[in-house]
Amino acid sequence: RISSSVIAHKTQLDSGKREVYSSHMQLGGPK
């Protein structure tokens, strides 16, 4: 059984990665 805090932490990390990825795409993609 996974605790809800772990799920919340993973969700936060995933959304952070998406923000970084979208900002990279706006700059013309990852360097």
Swiss-Prot record:
Record bears the keyword 4Fe-4S: no
Region (Disordered), start-end ranges: 1-31
Extent of Basic and acidic residues compositional bias: 11-21
MF terms in GO: acetyl-CoA carboxylase activity; ATP binding
Pathway: Lipid metabolism; malonyl-CoA biosynthesis; malonyl-CoA from acetyl-CoA: step 1/1
GO biological process: fatty acid biosynthetic process; malonyl-CoA biosynthetic process
EC number(s) recorded for this UniProt protein: 6.4.1.2
Domain of life: Eukaryota
Coiled-coil spans in chain: none
Additional free-text comment from the UniProt record: On the 2D-gel the determined pI of this protein is: 4.86, its MW is: 16.9 kDa.
Protein name listed in UniProt: Acetyl-CoA carboxylase
